[in-house]
């Protein structure tokens, strides 16, 4: 015999759960639309989805903050690096298309691997690369990650941030590189980043892989924001002081050229 359930005992979904469900549904609808037709402005998204502009504005701001969307200089929205990683559309990014031209020029000069990376939380994420023809080379691929505090690409992006921002990314202060070098906490990292900022480029001598040298320069938009890092990776067996100087100089020129191509772009940093 079943026991009647009193009215006060009836199970119902809490308002907070209903609200969260609606919020997720709204967010996914915005992402679906951006995947199909971006870039779009707030008014266009609002009209297409039949949503209040204030709701669209709130959702898009959260997506931008989390790296799922980006906003251009005309305040239109497009998919961010996190969404592009899932959709496989990274090759369509304007910055990646422009990178191919700059990379070809650099390879013609030095025949060394050149990569494009963005900051993804506490890690540096490769979104494009062109490889050297040498049999001895860095073995990596698009989608690979390295600790931002240890890599040349990560450091060149972190150097554009304040100490407070960097400290928030690495709150525990335990900084050991993949090859076992232990930094003396955040103070040493801050010192390294200050030097990177002063030099205009970052270097890495065997901190992410034994036998590997890397140099990286920032790619900036017209506002001076760092969009990405342009990085070359060279086995230490092929590096001399003279060759290192030429590589860094030509990499800086390549970074400036790429910055000119993508001056209008917003940032791609994905925050956790």
Outline where the language-model segments fall.
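Short, solvent-exposed recognition segments
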Residues: 2-10, 135-208
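N-terminal helix-turn-helix
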Residues: 2-96, 256, 260-264
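Amphipathic alpha-helical regulatory segments at dimerization interfaces
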Residues: 33, 48, 98-109, 115, ...
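Amphipathic alpha-helical effector-binding/dimerization core
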Residues: 75-173
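Short loop/turn motifs at secondary-structure junctions and domain boundaries
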Residues: 108-109, 206-211
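Juxtadomain coupling helices with adjacent low-complexity linkers
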Residues: 192-194, 199, 210-211, 226-272
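Sensor-regulatory modules in signal-transduction proteins
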Residues: 219-222
């Amino acid at each position: 015999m079943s026991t009647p359930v009193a009215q006060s005992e009836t199970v119902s979904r809490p308002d907070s759960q209903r609200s969260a469900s609606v919020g997720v549904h709204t967010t996914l609808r915005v992402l679906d639309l951006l995947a199909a037709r971006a870039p779009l402005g707030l008014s266009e998204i609002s009209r297409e989805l039949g949503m209040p502009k204030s709701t669209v504005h709130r959702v898009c701001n959260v997506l931008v903050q989390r790296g799922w969307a980006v906003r251009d200089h005309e305040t239109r929205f497009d998919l961010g690096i996190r969404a592009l990683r899932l959709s496989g559309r990274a090759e369509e990014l304007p910055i990646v298309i422009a990178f191919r031209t700059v990379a070809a020029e650099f390879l013609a000069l030095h025949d060394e691997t050149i990569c494009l990376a963005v900051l993804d939380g506490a890690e540096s994420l490769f979104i494009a690369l062109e490889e050297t023809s040498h049999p001895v080379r860095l073995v990596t691929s698009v989608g690979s990650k390295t600790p931002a505090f240890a890599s040349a690409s990560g450091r060149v992006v972190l150097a554009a941030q304040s100490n407070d921002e960097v400290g928030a990314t690495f709150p525990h202060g335990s900084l050991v590189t993949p090859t076992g070098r232990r930094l003396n906490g955040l103070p040493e990292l801050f010192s390294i980043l200050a030097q990177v900022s002063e030099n205009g480029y970052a270097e890495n001598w065997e901190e992410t892989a034994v036998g590997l040298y890397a140099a990286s320069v920032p790619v900036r938009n017209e506002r001076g924001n760092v969009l990405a890092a342009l990085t070359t990776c060279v086995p230490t067996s092929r590096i001399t002081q003279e060759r290192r100087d030429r590589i860094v100089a030509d990499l800086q020129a390549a970074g400036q050229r790429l910055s000119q191509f993508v001056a209008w772009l917003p940032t791609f940093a994905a925050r956790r």
